[in-house]
From Swiss-Prot:
Residues 322-344 are annotated as: Disordered. This is Small neutral protease regulatory protein. GO terms for molecular function: DNA binding; DNA-binding transcription factor activity. It comes from Streptomyces lividans. Belongs to the LysR transcriptional regulatory family. Residues 1-60 form the HTH lysR-type domain. Keywords: Activator, DNA-binding, Transcription, Transcription regulation. Residues 20-39 bind DNA. Pfam families: HTH_1, LysR_substrate. SUPFAM superfamilies: Periplasmic binding protein-like II, Winged helix' DNA-binding domain.
């Protein structure tokens, strides 16, 4: 059997997912099919590439060597396809943007649009899914958020720009809720409320659960997407975490949580050239949206740090990167960050 590009993609998917089950789901194939394919690849290369354990799969020394060569090859192949498609389009370049939900999106796309460049948008609640699409050549850049304490699976061949190191998450509650009368809400004030979270958003459930558990709360939790949550907040059924750039409405109130107990890191992922080209527009669009939110603007003016900090990236294993909270002033020239490559 000769190795093909699809085989290399399968190996990288297994390494990034950490298990055959999760990798098969991401690739859209049955697990037995992927397992059979892996066995054939290992036979062709002369040895096992992963150790199978109850908790998942880990690359063997041979596997790390193969993955170290496979990832650059996939990057080059994706670049070849992207450049060929652009040339075939006669120079009418399309910038393929992926993003999780953000109020900065409209302003960002507006700033990117110009003669000869038409941005397209793919939305997904899963940041990990968007990052994989960039690696696979389906997207050029992806704007994602990483919930504090819930590291994303960031492929080694992506480069990152940190837009905001720690964006505090606020709470949306009914406008007539007693706690809405104050500009800052304590979690204890919401002890009797039901919460709604979206379990399909990478890290959201874990982050909210950890935040509530830290203050001794174990509230009733419903599952639903953001639009469902906003509707139920308006009718007084639930409260929910929200982006600080969210705006209050006549029937809902957006308030800061005391102590800012939950934060996310905002990242732009892509190739270096693409990041350099589109990051300034994203930066401007984000702070424009921030100023339009009364609650976020007051937080910033009251001492919240408008920061695009520098933070070294540390390997945590499994193709992940994590970064601690950073303090500092906002920089106009953020450094791009490359995830560490495995040794071997």
């Amino acid at each position: 059997m000769e190795l093909e590009v699809r085989h290399l993609r399968a190996l990288c998917a297994i390494a990034d997912a950490g298990s055959l089950h999760r990798a098969a789901r991401r690739l859209g194939v049955a697990q037995p099919t992927l397992s059979t394919q892996l066995t054939r690849i290992e036979q062709a290369l002369g040895g096992p590439l992963f150790t199978r354990e109850r908790t998942g799969c880990r690359p063997t020394p041979l596997g790390r060597t193969v993955l170290g060569r496979a990832r650059p090859l996939l990057t080059d192949m994706n670049t070849l396809v992207r450049e060929a498609r652009a040339a075939a389009a006669g120079g009418d370049s399309r910038l393929r943007v992926g993003s999780t939900a953000s109020r900065a999106l409209a302003g960002w796309l507006r700033r990117l649009r110009r003669p000869g460049l038409e941005p397209t948008l793919q939305m997904d609640v899963s940041a990990n899914a968007l990052l994989r699409r960039v690696t696979d050549g389906q997207l050029d850049v992806a704007f994602v958020h990483e919930v504090e304490g819930c590291a994303l699976h960031i492929p080694e061949d992506l480069r990152l720009r940190v837009l905001v190191e720690r964006e505090p998450q606020f709470v949306m509650l009914p406008a007539d809720h007693p706690a809405a009368a104050r500009p800052v809400v304590r979690l204890a004030d919401l002890a009797d409320d039901r919460w709604m979270v979206d379990p399909t958003v990478d890290g959201e459930w874990d982050g909210v659960h950890r935040m509530l558990r830290a203050v001794g709360l174990n509230p009733r939790v419903l599952h639903g997407d953001y639009h469902t949550a906003a509707s139920l907040v308006a009718t007084g059924e639930v409260v929910t975490v929200c982006q600080p750039s969210s705006q209050s409405r006549p029937d809902t109130a957006v308030r800061r949580l005391y102590g800012d107990p939950l934060g996310v890191r905002l990242l732009l992922a892509g190739t270096r050239a693409e990041l350099d080209a589109v990051f300034p527009a994203l930066e401007d669009a984000y702070w424009e949206a921030a100023r339009q939110s009364t609650a976020y603007r007051e937080w910033l003016e009251g001492g919240g740090i408008r920061t695009l900090p520098r933070c070294p990236v540390a390997a945590t294993g499994g193709g992940r990167v994590s970064c601690g909270r950073a303090e500092g002033s906002r920089s106009r020239r953020p450094r791009d960050v490359a995830p560490p490559r495995p040794i071997g």
